[in-house]
Amino acid sequence: MPLPKELFVDTSFWFAAMVATDVNHECAGELLEEAAVGASRFHTTRVVTSETLSLLRYRDGARSALLFARDIVPTVEMAVADLTDHAAALEVFRLLAPRRRLSYCDALSFVIVRQRLGDMACLAFDRDFRALGLTVLA
């Protein structure tokens, strides 16, 4: 089954794609190839981009983070979160964080995917995305 034409991408996927030692690296690479063949467009947020750059920098080094910034970030559609999105994400975080390991970044991604991107399918290795009821393909 081919990938959808539009996909939301989470930090967990970006990290796996960039870091050869990540347990999900091979799967991420296969999905990236499939997305290229099908001309899928990637969407993310600036918060996911920030989280990814920081994670790459601290866990894999500056080179990896700089490659991501140079080669990947310019090719991705940025879903820009406004104050209403941030307020909704904060409410999701307040409701779920006490009983679930949930980051604010994932709460904001949930709001963006559901309210801005029409419940778009996601590329993520983060279990939180499935737990939130999002459609996860990776």
Residue ranges and their predicted role:
Residues 1-43, 57-68:
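Short, well-structured N-terminal submotif of metal-dependent ribonuclease cores
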Residues 21-22, 59-63, 75, 79, ...:
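Residues at alpha-helix boundaries and the short loops/turns that link adjacent helices
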Residues 37-42, 75-77, 117-120:
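Short active-site oxyanion
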Residues 9, 43-44, 80, 104, ...:
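Short beta-strand scaffold positions
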Residues 78-120:
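Active-site neighborhoods of divalent-metal-dependent phosphate/nucleic-acid chemistry enzymes
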Residues 1-6, 110-138:
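Acidic, PIN/NYN-like endoribonuclease modules and their adjacent C-terminal/linker elements
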